[in-house]
Swiss-Prot record:
Domain of life: Eukaryota
InterPro entries noted in UniProt: Tctex-1-like, Tctex-1-like_sf
Gene Ontology terms describing biological process: cell division; establishment of mitotic spindle orientation; intracellular transport of viral protein in host cell; microtubule-based movement; microtubule-dependent intracellular transport of viral material towards nucleus; negative regulation of neurogenesis; nervous system development; regulation of G protein-coupled receptor signaling pathway
Lineage start: Eukaryota, Metazoa, Chordata, Craniata, Vertebrata
Task of the protein: Acts as one of several non-catalytic accessory components of the cytoplasmic dynein 1 complex that are thought to be involved in linking dynein to cargos and to adapter proteins that regulate dynein function. Cytoplasmic dynein 1 acts as a motor for the intracellular retrograde motility of vesicles and organelles along microtubules. Binds to transport cargos and is involved in apical cargo transport such as rhodopsin-bearing vesicles in polarized epithelia. May also be a accessory component of axonemal dynein. Plays a role in neuronal morphogenesis; the function is independent of cytoplasmic dynein and seems to be coupled to regulation of the actin cytoskeleton by enhancing Rac1 activity. The function in neurogenesis may be regulated by association with a G-protein beta-gamma dimer. May function as a receptor-independent activator of heterotrimeric G-protein signaling; the activation appears to be independent of a nucleotide exchange. Plays a role in regulating neurogenesis; inhibits the genesis of neurons from precursor cells during cortical development presumably by antagonizing ARHGEF2.
Name of the featured protein: Dynein light chain Tctex-type 1
GO terms for cellular component: cytoplasm; cytoplasmic dynein complex; cytoplasmic microtubule; dynein complex; extracellular region; ficolin-1-rich granule lumen; Golgi apparatus; host cell
Organism: Homo sapiens (Human)
Assembly, per entry: Homodimer. The cytoplasmic dynein 1 complex consists of two catalytic heavy chains (HCs) and a number of non-catalytic subunits presented by intermediate chains (ICs), light intermediate chains (LICs) and light chains (LCs); the composition seems to vary in respect to the IC, LIC and LC composition. The heavy chain homodimer serves as a scaffold for the probable homodimeric assembly of the respective non-catalytic subunits. The ICs and LICs bind directly to the HC dimer and the LCs assemble on the IC dimer. DYNLT1 and DYNLT3 compete for association with dynein IC (DYNC1I1 or DYNC1I2).
């Protein structure tokens, strides 16, 4: 049981990271409609708040967070990522959030130190 708790304390827990990302998106964008002039501010706020909250977890990781905000206008968007890492210690999480006017896609990567 102690080994499980120790592993949990140093693991990249996808559900935990996903919740942090969702909270950051809601806080930064919330119920706003897409405004091109605000996108830079929103993306910066999302990644900085996400990084801040991940760091507060106190886990032995280096983090990488990306954020894409795209207006809903019928255009397609395809993204992919590939990582060469130790899947037993490192992890990633991608959250897709949307409202009536935009999509927000955030990826968070945790690399064990």
């Amino acid at each position: 049981m102690e080994d499980y708790q120790a592993a949990e304390e140093t693991a990249f827990v996808v559900d935990e990271v996903s919740n942090i990302v969702k909270e950051a998106i809601e806080s930064a964008i919330g119920g706003n409609a897409y405004q091109h002039s605000k996108v830079n501010q929103w993306t910066t706020n999302v990644v900085e708040q996400t990084l801040s909250q991940l760091t507060k977890l106190g886990k032995p990781f280096k983090y990488i967070v990306t954020c894409v905000i795209m207006q809903k206008n019928g255009a397609g968007l395809h993204t992919a990522s590939s990582c060469f890492w130790d899947s037993s210690t490192d992890g990633s999480c991608t959250v897709r959030w949307e409202n009536k006017t935009m999509y927000c896609i955030v990826s968070a990567f945790g690399l064990s130190i």
